[in-house]
Regions:
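Walker A/P-loop
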Residues: 107-128
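A contiguous, basic/glycine-rich beta-loop/short-helix subdomain that forms a polymer-engagement track
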Residues: 236-257, 275-276, 364-477
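Signature of the SF2 helicase/ATPase Hel1-core->accessory helical subdomain module
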Residues: 235, 241-261, 266-369, 431-443
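Conserved pre-motif I regulatory segment
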Residues: 67-113
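Walker A/P-loop NTP-binding motif
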Residues: 104, 123-136, 155-159
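Acidic, Mg2+-coordinating catalytic module of metal-dependent nucleases/exonucleases
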Residues: 1-38
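A substrate-engagement module of RecA-like helicase motors
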Residues: 78-81, 137-139, 143-259
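Interdomain "pre-motor" coupling segment immediately N-terminal to P-loop NTPase/helicase cores
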Residues: 29-75
Length: 478
């Protein structure tokens, strides 16, 4: 087995472009024992030319996989069972019933909220009927988490792309993508940590394979997150960038405009709709697991800053002595304001603040320039959207961490961004939250058409009640 693994490794290295192997050699001293010799052997006899599937920028030596070109889309059948069969799947009665409900709702101009039980294959249930309609141009699908987003791209999207040539794109925030400029700068140095240098080698190989630049494709990166924080994208692209034409975040933005189906997550959907009110204009928007969008709206209306980490960071900057006199004074003012807030919180834990009460802190933040890490932590507080501030402290065995938290006066009005969409379909495992409240109310939506599909009662569920405990309604506060 070890010998087979070695042969596989040798074949893999030999299949890489020569330019990539040469860059691997610059870091090969960080490998264990004599593994470097395998790389040196692989470069012998390597062709100097570069295959058409790759592209390289001579100044950096980094080799990338050339962006894919998409084939003409195949037309889907109007019959759900036929499309399912073409995917080599079997149609399920409840899945088909759900798909038929989706088709019926397309003629309704109101927002449609469809309640359907879990486990019936809802993703194909809404994708197939929507993609089969000639008047449905583009579709945006929002799911609760990046994990589910990746799952759809690896399963349903991959199958639909293979059979029908449907152009899917997974859209995430810029921090999910590698920034090639930042990565290139790390290649110009040999880190003292061998693990970091091995990650550089891994990324050089990965860049010859990835079509997205999505760092979620890298496994076990949590082992050294500090390095990945250094090379993740910040959403900015310098005019003189060596990689302007191949920047993954810019490519992702462009692909999102061209794709037939864009898959994103609830949190990033809210971010994009707030930044770009036309993001869903003329498109069919499907919010999957709509009941969880309520939590995303609540999280989106808040922001927090770790004041303990902030103070540590300010202290390190001041100790370095590299700042100008003005910057030093501003940092000292910021340090004083933050320390004062923490001390005040220890005396009055329930105290809340408005923007006027934090005016000096916010003013110092606005004047502070050149400290990008600090600004990244603090800049969201400058927006007038946040009106209420308070502090919270988490206690651990040997230390405590204090956070400055900010919230908006009201939750984001989701309905303000939806009228531009061609059609909005919210799929939810439940519509009713209580006797007088439902998911639509919590999302702040009016003119919602609610459709509840029959749901099977699951016989394997049980609720256990401890009868020795007092009833909540009659128990005293003591």
């Amino acid at each position: 087995a070890t010998g087979q693994l070695l042969f596989h490794l040798m074949d893999k290295i030999a299949s890489l472009p020569r330019q990539t192997i040469e860059m691997l050699l610059t870091f090969s001293d960080n490998l264990l024992f004599e593994t470097e010799l395998v790389i040196r052997d692989a470069i012998r006899g390597q062709n100097l030319g570069l295959s058409k599937e790759y592209v390289t920028l001579e100044e950096s030596g980094i080799v990338l996989r050339r962006p894919l070109t998409y084939k003409a889309e195949r037309k889907l059948s109007q019959d759900f069972d036929t499309n399912i069969a073409l995917l080599d799947l079997e149609s399920r009665p409840k899945q088909k019933e759900f798909a038929e409900a989706v088709i019926r709702e397309l003629d309704n101009t109101d927002i449609s909220m469809i309640q359907a039980q879990t486990g019936i294959g809802k993703t194909y249930g809404y994708l197939l009927p929507l993609l089969a309609q000639s008047d449905v141009d583009k579709v945006v699908v929002a799911v609760p988490t990046k994990l589910l987003q990746n799952q759809i791209m690896n399963q349903e999207a991959k199958a639909l792309s293979a059979v029908f040539n449907i152009n899917f794109h997974s859209l995430k925030g810029p921090q999910n993508y590698i920034k090639l400029d930042a990565f290139y700068q790390t290649l110009l140095r040999q880190d003292s940590n061998r693990l970091v240098n091995r990650y550089k080698m891994q990324l050089l190989v990965w860049l010859t394979e990835t079509e997205t630049g999505d760092l979620d494709e890298i496994r076990q990166k949590q082992r050294y997150m500090a390095y990945f924080d250094e090379i993740k994208h910040d959403g900015k692209l310098e005019a003189d960038s060596l990689f302007a034409e191949y920047d993954f975040w810019q490519q992702s933005y462009q692909k999102a405009q061209e794709a037939r189906v864009v898959v994103t997550n609830h949190a990033y959907l809210l971010t994009r709709m707030e930044d770009d009110h036309d993001f869903v204009r003329g498109k069919t928007l499907v919010i999957d697991e709509g009941q969880k969008m309520v939590l995303a709206l609540e999280q989106f209306s808040r922001h927090q800053v770790n004041l303990t980490v902030l103070l540590q960071h300010i202290h390190r900057i001041l100790d370095s002595g590299s700042q100008s006199l003005l910057q030093q004074r501003l940092l000292e003012n910021l340090q004083f304001e933050v320390s004062h807030l923490i001390q005040e919180h220890q005396q009055f834990p329930q105290k809340q603040y408005n923007r006027q009460q934090l005016d000096r802190l916010l003013q110092t933040i606005s004047e502070l320039e050149g400290e990008s890490d600090l600004m990244e932590m603090l800049s969201p507080l400058k927006t007038p959207l946040y009106s209420h501030f308070w502090l919270e402290t988490d206690y651990y065995q040997e230390h405590r961490v204090t956070y400055l938290k900010a919230s908006r006066q009201e939750l984001l009005e989701l309905s303000a961004y939806l009228p531009s969409a061609q059609k909005v379909i919210i799929v939810s495992a439940t519509i009713d939250v209580g006797p007088d409240v439902d998911v639509a109310d919590l999302l702040g939506l009016d003119q919602v058409r609610k459709v509840s599909l029959p749901m099977d009662t699951l016989p394997n569920q049980a609720i256990w009640i401890d009868q020795s405990m007092p009833m909540i309604g009659i128990a005293s506060e003591e």
